[in-house]
Amino acid sequence: MTTLIYLQIPVPEPIPGDPVPVPDPIPRPQPMPDPPPDEEPIKLSHRERRSARIRAC
C-alpha cells in the first residue's frame, strides 16, 4: 500500500554540484623491504646441482 504512494511522488533530480568525495581505497600491505646484503648472499637459484632439496631425499 505504501509503495503506491512512493511511486506517485516524483523523485527530484540530483542537483549538479560538487561531486561526492570517494574515500581512498584501503592501501594494500607493502612487501617487506629487502634486508641488507650479508657477506655471503643467500642463493635462491634452483640451478645448483647440489641443492638442499636433493640432499634431503
Curated annotation (Swiss-Prot):
Biased composition annotated in UniProt, kind: Basic residues: 46-57
Domain of life: Bacteria
InterPro entries: YnaL-like
Region Disordered, residue ranges: 7-57
Induction per the UniProt record: Expressed during stationary phase (at protein level).
Biased composition (Pro residues): 11-35
One Pfam family matching this protein: YnaL
Protein name, entry field: Protein YnaL
